[in-house]
């Protein structure tokens, strides 16, 4: 169970880190913004799966 807790904490940190990076993307760099949004969506999906598994 400790491994899942560690993995969950790391996933939460990764989501927060990507959210912060997305906030400071230059307005003229749409390609970077799209890439960060896709990565953030994937990280959020992974976080949701980990939370569901952790609660089970």
Regions found by a protein language model. Name each.
Residues 1-3, 52-56:
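Short intrinsically disordered terminal tails
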Residues 1-13, 28, 35:
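Short, charge/polar-rich alpha-helical segments
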Residues 11-25, 43, 47-50:
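Non-transmembrane amphipathic alpha-helical segments
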């Amino acid at each position: 169970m400790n491994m899942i807790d560690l993995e969950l904490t790391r996933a939460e940190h990764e989501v927060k880190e990507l959210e912060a990076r997305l906030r400071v993307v230059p307005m003229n760099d749409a390609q970077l913004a799209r890439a960060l949004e896709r990565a953030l969506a994937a990280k959020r999906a992974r976080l949701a799966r980990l939370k569901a598994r952790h609660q089970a």
